[in-house]
Amino acid sequence: MPKLFSSLNRLGSPQIFLILFFLGVIIYSNVVSYPFVHDERIFILQNPSIGDLNIKDIFLTPPAAPNDFSLVNTYYRPFLELLNRLLYKVFGFNSSGYHLVNILLHILNSFLVFQITQILGGKRKTLSLILAVVFLIHPIQSEAVACISGISNLLFTLLGLFSFLFYLWFSEKESIFLHILSLLLFLAALFVKEQAVIFPFLILFYEFCFAPPFNSSVARVIKQTAGFFIILAGYFWIRTSLIGFPITNMAAADPEFWLRIRLIPGSLLMYLGLIFFPHHLHYFRRVDMLQPFIFSTVSFFVILIGAGYLAFFVKGQRRLLIFGIGWFLLSQIPTLNIVPIVMEYSFLLAAEHFMYFPLVGILLFVGGLGSYFIPLSQENMKSKVNTIGGIVLFLSGSVFMAATIKQNTYWRGDIPLFERTLQFEKNFGRGHLLLAQAYTAHG
C-alpha cells in the first residue's frame, strides 16, 4: 500500500485523468442503453423547439409559464436549452448519446475537483486523487449522472468549477485574462442553472479564508470580486425582465415561510447522512415541513459546532476546513426550499442531485482532516496507519462503486424508477399517478 501511494504521487495530470475516465466508464456504462424517462420526454422528445437553433429566441424568449399540469417551470436557462438543441442536432432522439455526454461531464468534473483540491490542499496529489475518486463514484451522484435531465447539475458544476479554478490561477498569477475567463464562465453557469448565484459569495468566502489578513486587503478583494456581483445583478435584471418576477419575491410574504426555514437544519442533517451513509437513495425525495424539527435542529448544530471545533483545532488545515464547511452550506442556499420547490401539500422536494455541487465542500473538509491525521508525505509512506487507511479506502470505494452501479439501474425505465420512489414515499400522490401512467404506457 505505501508503494501504491508513492506511485500515485508520481503520476502526471494526463495519467490522473485516465484513471478517472476508466473508473467513470466502469461505473456508468450500464446507463448508456437506458431510454428517456419522465421529464426528459417533456424537455427533449416533446419539445417543439428542440430543432431550432435561433440564438435570439433561446436567450430572449420568455420561458413557458408554469401550471398545475405541466412539468415545464419558469426556468431561465438559455445555455442549457442551447446545449440540448445542439445535442439533438448530433444525436437526434438517440438517448445513448445524451447519456455519454453526461458521463463525460461527470468525469471532467471529478478531474476539476482533483485540480482544485491540489491547489487548496497544498499539492497533496494522492489525497486529491482520492477525493476526486470519491466525487466520481459516490452513489448520491447517480441521480445527476444517470438521469439525462441531470445535465443541468453537471454543466453548471463544470462551468462553476472552471470559473473557480481560473480565479485561483488569477489570484496566483494576477493575469487579467484569467480573471476575465473566470467571469465569463460564471456568467455561463448562471445561464445553465440558478444555483450558480452562490458563486460570488463562495469566492468572497474563499478570500476571507485564504487571503492575507482581511483588513489589510479589503480594497483588493472588492476589486477582484466586484465583477462577479455586477454580473449577478445583471443576470437578475435579465431574468426579471423576461419572467416578470425575481427568484425570491415569494419568500418573505409566504405564510409558510418560517415553516420552511425551521426545516433547513433537518434537511442539512439528512443530506449529511446521505453523503456519509448513502442508503435508501431514490427519485423525488421529499421532506415534510410539518414534521417535528427540534431534535434534528439540535443534532445538526451539535455536528456543526463539532466541525467548527475541529477546524480550529487542526491548525495546519484550519483555512481549508472552514472553507469546506462554507462551501457545503453556501452552495445549498438556493435548494433549501427558502423558495418552495415542487411542493405537494406540506411536502417539499429534497432531491439527491442537489448534493452534486455541495459534495465538493464535504470532500474539502474530509481532505483537510485526512491530511492532518493521516499524512501522505514521503516520510510517512511506510506507516501502518497509511496501510490501514489504504485498505479502508479500497473497501469503501468498492462498496460505493457497487452501490452506484446498482442505483443506476433504477433509471432504466419509468416503472422501476417510480416503483423505487414509492418504496420510500408511500404517500406521494404524484408518484402514484406517474407510476400508473408508466404501467399504462407499457401495457
State where each predicted segment sits.
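Polytopic membrane enzymes that build or remodel cell-surface glycoconjugates and lipids
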Residues: 1-443
